[in-house]
Amino acid sequence: MGGCVSVSLSCDREVNQFSQWLCVSGSYIQNLSENLASLQKAMGVLNAKRDDVQGRINREEFTGHRRRLAQVQVWLTRIQTIENQFNDLLSTCNAEIQRLCLCGFCSKNVKMSYLYGKRVIVLLREVEGLSSQGVFDIVTEAAPIAEVEELPIQSTIVGQDSMLDKVWNCLMEDKVWIVGLYGMGGVGKTTLLTQINNKFSKLGGGFDVVIWVVVSKNATVHKIQKSIGEKLGLVGKNWDEKNKNQRALDIHNVLRRKKFVLLLDDIWEKVELKVIGVPYPSGENGCKVAFTTHSKEVCGRMGVDNPMEISCLDTGNAWDLLKKKVGENTLGSHPDIPQLARKVSEKCCGLPLALNVIGETMSFKRTIQEWRHATEVLTSATDFSGMEDEILPILKYSYDSLNGEDAKSCFLYCSLFPEDFEIRKEMLIEYWICEGFIKEKQGREKAFNQGYDILGTLVRSSLLLEGAKDKDVVSMHDMVREMALWIFSDLGKHKERCIVQAGIGLDELPEVENWRAVKRMSLMNNNFEKILGSPECVELITLFLQNNYKLVDISMEFFRCMPSLAVLDLSENHSLSELPEEISELVSLQYLDLSGTYIERLPHGLHELRKLVHLKLERTRRLESISGISYLSSLRTLRLRDSKTTLDTGLMKELQLLEHLELITTDISSGLVGELFCYPRVGRCIQHIYIRDHWERPEESVGVLVLPAIHNLCYISIWNCWMWEIMIEKTPWKKNLTNPNFSNLSNVRIEGCDGLKDLTWLLFAPNLINLRVWGCKHLEDIISKEKAASVLEKEILPFQKLECLNLYQLSELKSIYWNALPFQRLRCLDILNNCPKLRKLPLDSKSVVKVEEFVIKYKEKKWIERVEWEDEATQYRFLPTCRLR
């Protein structure tokens, strides 16, 4: 009997448990619709809480001084995961509801409905749990202050991860204060140090400031101090005039109060930190120094006992890098190409620079014959002894692959500049034209188009590097420059063909055995005070003497034996006040740059230079006159910007006589602008114009400035003028235009014009890119609605190509434009100071296409609080882009 009772109790318990399970399981199915509705409601509540928290974070983080708490980020990340699961459930809910039968009490597939219903309940509990956790008193904390400028870096990096971790970990060790990285050129030292710099920008490391300095060969204390001073905000006219000891003291006084990291790229000798003003890093101050160099010996001199060698890539990583550069399409274009590509990779000896350059060169070679030719050419690299001789022929292959001798000559020409020198593209193309690499017979515009095409080819071939911030400059990698000089000298056989001793501190002419063999000579950036002698340079075509700040005198005999000289650059020689009359003997001269010199008059002999095409006289602030310039019958470009000599009626008459003139940059007073209507050739040629009134000559100013709609005008600056209105008129030489139009005007600067109330004339500049308006006390509108209606037959939408708008000290400014504008290209809106009445910006929720790249910079905290946004959507779109400067 007792046994029966025991069995009965056991069965009852199991039946009870089964019935409970059945009840719960049944609820998964029977209550599915209600559970889904509860889940949707709970998810809506959770999303609302998330949006509230995210909004708080955005408002607190946009200044850059705070960062979100880790626990808040975990909560937000978990919501994202939950939301994905919720969307997954929701995507099949209709099918699951239709699977139910018997009024929802059963299912056509009980197992499937049970599993789905259980997922709904489990997710509902998680959502409710997350919702209850989403109550935060604070959502951000003070961000660690680490001033780091993130540097651009190539997209394809292979084989450096382990070395990056090794260097970073070493740098973070308490007992390590200086880290030295050494290795051959082109091996990736700069890339590695750049990654270290950028890692600081992401992780901080507890440092106040990270300073990046490119040192290079023959660097001076002044150059290094200037780079550090710029980062610390010390630069300026007064600071530049101090001696190195005073600058060192200033640097030291700033850095001794900071925990800093100093990154020195490409040092060739010991850098005396004390002389520069940098406190020596130690355990006490917690500061760090890291540097790259070609020499292990330099590491020892810098006090590094265990420097890290950056070696070439191993075979596997080298092959991976070449594959990425060549691309799968090219490698797959013929079954034999991968095998030949491996041979090419082996010939590069693991040098990243060679792999990058040759990989990009071969990326469009898709025939087996081209790859066979590549392996044949690269085989000759083994015929040279020494590392340099193994590298340069490899690099030369990309040079050999350039189409045409003109492109090759243009590339080699870039090696005349110092290491790491940023060369302005426009200046470089003018050099190329005068050298004859580019023909100008069909006009300046076509010649420049060809020049930019060549530059694009050289950049894409990795033979030139385009500026990271300034796209108008290019530079050369050190090893590529060495290769170019090697080619210039006929692979080292005739080194005197090209003398390049730029930026090495010369104070007298170099010793050259055979001056008659010299074709190009670059002595720029040196310490000449006088240039004496009469070298017999009968083959000399190019002579660079610019940036010799101490140069006072050039002897009369110096230019006597240079009959072939076509390019002479004497710019930025600030102590040079006169030129010898013997310059008239440079009968082949086509390019003369005297910009930034202190010359007071042009030598009479200059008038004899009948082949002169380009004359640059910008920033010649003591130059009294250029009368007689009409004798230069071949002149095409005249640059006079910021010169003491301005465009007056007499000069206009002379320039009108120059039949080949195509480009002028000049200053002019507002009262003389109207004279341009009388001199059509001069008007057509003006590309940069600087309109300035002289306080001592008020009779030259006007109340209404009438601008001729100059088609070629690219840049206009109106500074300290007294006019109260600017009007546009069609020019006599463009009468066929319906409306006056500045079709090429891209840059406008207006400063200190207190009488102006609006700039409505900008409606006639449809291709404007940069607009800067400063210190116009009575300016009320950029574009006036009333005036626009009076001058236009139909509405024109302004600023469609505007990229940067800079406004400063405009106390009466109320409006930029009366309606919201699309601003398809706008990247930066600067409201720098004292624009208190500008409350409404021409923005709505659809303005600015790439809002993620857009920034609104402002200097007064109260200003952003007074902004009247179009609506909440507009505020939500643009408030995170605002940055307090």
From Swiss-Prot:
Changing residue 226 to R: In strain: cv. Cvi-0, cv. Kas-0, cv. Landsberg erecta and cv. Mt-0. Changing residue 473 to F: In strain: cv. Cvi-0, cv. Kas-0, cv. Landsberg erecta and cv. Mt-0. Changing residue 532 to F: In strain: cv. Cvi-0, cv. Kas-0, cv. Landsberg erecta and cv. Mt-0. Changing residue 607 to Q: In strain: cv. Bla-1, cv. Bur-0, cv. Cvi, cv. Kas-0, cv. Landsberg erecta, cv. Mt-0 and cv. Wu-0. Changing residue 289 to I: In strain: cv. Cvi-0, cv. Kas-0, cv. Landsberg erecta and cv. Mt-0. Changing residue 419 to D: In strain: cv. Ct-1 and cv. Tamm-17. Residues 27-61 form a coiled coil. GO terms for molecular function: ADP binding; ATP binding. Residues 141-443 form the NB-ARC domain. Pfam families: LRR_14, NB-ARC, WH_DRP. Changing residue 138 to V: In strain: cv. Cvi-0, cv. Kas-0, cv. Landsberg erecta and cv. Mt-0. Keywords: ATP-binding, Coiled coil, Leucine-rich repeat, Nucleotide-binding, Plant defense, Repeat. The LRR repeats probably act as specificity determinant of pathogen recognition. Disease resistance (R) protein. Belongs to the disease resistance NB-LRR family. In contrast to RPS5, which is absent in cv. Landsberg erecta, RFL1 in present in both cv. Columbia and cv. Landsberg erecta. This is Disease resistance protein RFL1.
